[in-house]
Amino acid sequence: MLLEPVMMKIEEVILESSLVRSFIFKTCSERSESKSLEYQPGQFIMLWIPRLDEKPFSISYHGKDFFGVTVALKGRFTQRLHEMKVGEWAGIRGPFGRAFNLGACPEPQGCRACVVGGGVGMASLAVLIERLENSVVVQGARTASELLYRNRLKYMLLCTEDGSAGTNGVPTDLLEDLYRHYRFDAIYTCGPEAMMVRVLEFAREYNIYMQASLERYIKCAVGVCGQCCCNGLRLCVEGPVLDGGTLEKLEDFGRYARLGNGCRVTIGTYLGKKT
């Protein structure tokens, strides 16, 4: 874990959609002391642009000497990041947070998992999907042009709200039929919180182990400032991945989050703020 920013070079920029780009960083270079980034699916890094700010991003690509983050264009920080080119440098610290539990099943070797992703939430799930040996994956987006990793993750069921690709609807519309066919033992999800609330309800109804990766405003990433607290849980340390039993106890899940100034607002207001 890197507790202080280490400068790393952008090796590749991947255009995932018109508003989403992935930035691949080399972890071993003449200006970086790090030879590898020890990481488990679901963890995140803090990315620092000098003289601007630092923001958290899920690791969406990972290899022996590289890693990547997937970034949606939202505000001033992400605008600047989208303008960065191959050969430019950014400060990286981490990875931080609790990862997905790949050994959640009683018999992991025969475990069948269902992965439910929505929008840019797929970034938290991409490496997880690549490491799961036996899974069915559902991805949802508003329209076909917003679906991510279609060439990279070839075996996915797709949903779009406008019907432009795959099933017309949202990923949770498919859960009943998928469970009848696949009888999965665990569900992993990341995306819009309303979608994850429905996944939690489904998992409770069918007594299926589930984990969700939550998004909150993360500032220090080490559990000191309390900015990312959700009903007392510091999501940068105790999360961002939480299991169903924990989510059931969180009154704020699906309802409230905190802005950068600490104000508690509705999820809709929180997601509407640009970063």
Q: Where do the language-model regions lie?
A:
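Ferredoxin-reductase
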Residues: M1-E88
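Beta-strand residues in well-ordered beta-sheet regions across diverse protein folds
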Residues: I24-K26, T70, R93, V116, ...
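Short, charged beta-turn/beta-strand-edge "cap" motif at the junction between a beta-strand
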Residues: R51-E54, G94-A99, G254-R255
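FNR/FR-type flavoprotein reductase catalytic core
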Residues: R76-K219
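Local cysteine-cluster metal-coordination motifs and their immediate loop/turn environment
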Residues: S124, E193-A194, E215-P240
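Short Fe-S-cluster ligation motifs
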Residues: N231-E238, L242-T275
